[in-house]
Amino acid sequence: AYEMCGRDWSSDVCSSDLAMTLMVQAGHDPRQPHGRDLPDIEHLNADLKGKRIGWLGDWGGALPMEVGILETCEEALKVFDDLGCTVEKVAPPFQLELLWDSWITLRSWSIATSCAALFLDERTRDLLKPEAQWETERGLKLSAMDVHRASVIRSRWFEAAAKLFDSYDVLVLPTAQVWPFPVEWTWPKEIAGMTMDTYHRWMEVVVPAGLIGLPCLAVPAGFGAAGLPIGLQLIGRRGSDVALLRMGQGWHEAAPWAHLRPEVT
């Protein structure tokens, strides 16, 4: 309930399933500072005509992407055109490296609060994988001012994003910067020739929504040349969960996907 960065997620396969999950989980609770009641979402109205979609792409080149991801996502965005939405490219609304610095600071701080006891005890340290040890050690070295600076950036981004939602109902990013990679890899070491400086830099595309806890819905965009899948993040303003579910429902009705299978061997 008190995490600085959004990390809660659900793996429901469609908007209607997610709506049922939220009807069970969500709602006001005096023990939870951010809980709120939801309207009836059992029947989702999927009429999206007139909705404004902002496409952030690769954040003006700041996010390295493997070949084909942007093209597949941009082709998928045409579904919104068919639904009567307006899709526009959006210039980078904030310096991405600042968002990354804020996110990794708050994440390391959060991980350290959870794993410090294991890390500081030499008898249990090796129970943590190397990446967790690195992040815990990093978090333990942070000062109060480091966390404060990260929190200020987080607040500035929240304000900038809120202003952006005055022009757009939903912002869109790819769900990933890489196609699904071999199971033997722990994580991708480079993307499009750019070396990843941390074990989670390859997931930077999810930071803009996660850093400030915006509701985000992933929908399938399609398959690339190798038959591997990619999706779209549909990101809404704070409190727009129901509107985002309706957006996802409209997408699924216009672009049914459950019967599709990639041509892979």
What are these regions (language model features)?
Residues R7-E71, E75, F94, A254-T265:
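A short helix-breaking turn/cap at a secondary-structure junction
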